[in-house]
Amino acid sequence: MALEKLKYLLLPLLFLMAFPAWSTTITDIQIQGLKRTKPAVLLEKLEKFKDMPAEDFDKKQLESELQKTQLFSHIDAQVSGSTLIVTVEEKFSLLPIPFAYAASDSWGGGLVVLDSNAFGIMDQATIGGFVSADSWRVLGSYNHIQKNHSPFGWNISANGGKSDTKIRNDEGDLLLSYENTVFGASFGINRRLAPWLRASVSSGVNLCNVQDDAPHSQLIIPATLALTASTTSWDGTFLNETYLSVSATYNTSLWHESYSSIAVRAGYQQHLVQRLRLIAQGGLFYSPDVPVVSARNQSAVMVVLLNNACRSSAMAGGGVGLEWGIAQTRFGIPSIYAQYQAIWADTIMSDDITGHGPVAGFKFYLKKFAFPAVDIFTAYNVKTGLFRTSAGAGFSY
């Protein structure tokens, strides 16, 4: 009789020994701390963690996933039974932002109302205006981010203003000056082809009405096809991004000759050691038949060595360097960075130019707000001897 009872007592133990890999699966996700963000939108981003064995859950992976949104200042998660409990603290994402900047060759400021979490669904909306030393402009845009269960994302934008445009060579000599009124509007759709790959098409209208038609005024309908590959990762200090974007545009001119353009932009940010990362970026712009009023400056290739009033029909440039996060403070992360940059440009009204030199600056990434607030840098072009200094606070454009 005693042996019979012992047999029944040992059966559960034998069963557990036969299935040692038995584990709990995450079947439910609870989110705490949301204020503006709709829970359903955030749950979509966390779907990959559902039906995952509890012992396979990686808190750092979840933190990295949510840091990509740039909407949360605090993220915590723990598994309790079969429930994943996520606690977040949202950044301020709807704010009127006064901004100003001053550079050695320009100055400006204005006010923008930015919502980086429009309607609580992680869309982005902007409306505002600015003035500078020789122009004013108003603008508005809305960007609907593609969600997991939607077929595509879309964006719409419009802007208008007036400027006294001056085109200079790299030494700062004035080559051309004209007054012009501008208006632009665009609509585009985009689709995620893979977690790291997105395709987009867009079109619209661009009007540049030049006083006395010198150079020629332009009314252009652009059609753009773009492909962007990108990945992001959170290292505890910085949100690092690696990306490559290629776009081709055919510009139908209703008043003059049509023309085409190709643009490439790339960036690489990589964590090296604690609070230190490698930063590199570069670009290419090619549009040999571009009209004067549509020529681009060095911002097309993400370089800051030239005079901003220098316009080109083709250029290539880039830079590589390091950025160090000084400390994690209650307000955010101050950082210093240094790069060496180089550029070649086929200017529209003078000879080809090249330049290279160091760039050093300071940034402040705000903890409670979903955008950086301060960027100060100094650049020196070794080839021409040009110093450029820029200091900006608030919204960057």
Predicted regions and their residues:
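N-terminal signal peptide c-region/cleavage motif recognized by signal peptidases
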Residues: 18-20
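Soluble N-terminal domains of membrane-associated systems
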Residues: 12-13, 26
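Periplasmic polypeptide-binding modules associated with outer-membrane biogenesis and secretion
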Residues: 22-102, 112, 128-144, 205-209, ...
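Short acidic/His/Gly/Ser-rich catalytic and metal-binding motifs that mark active-site loops
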Residues: 38-39, 164-167, 290-292
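Gram-negative/organellar outer-membrane beta-barrel architecture
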Residues: 87-234, 242-243, 264, 295-302, ...
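Bacterial N-terminal signal peptides that target proteins for export
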Residues: 1-10
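C-terminal transmembrane beta-barrel domains of outer membrane proteins
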Residues: 46, 243-397
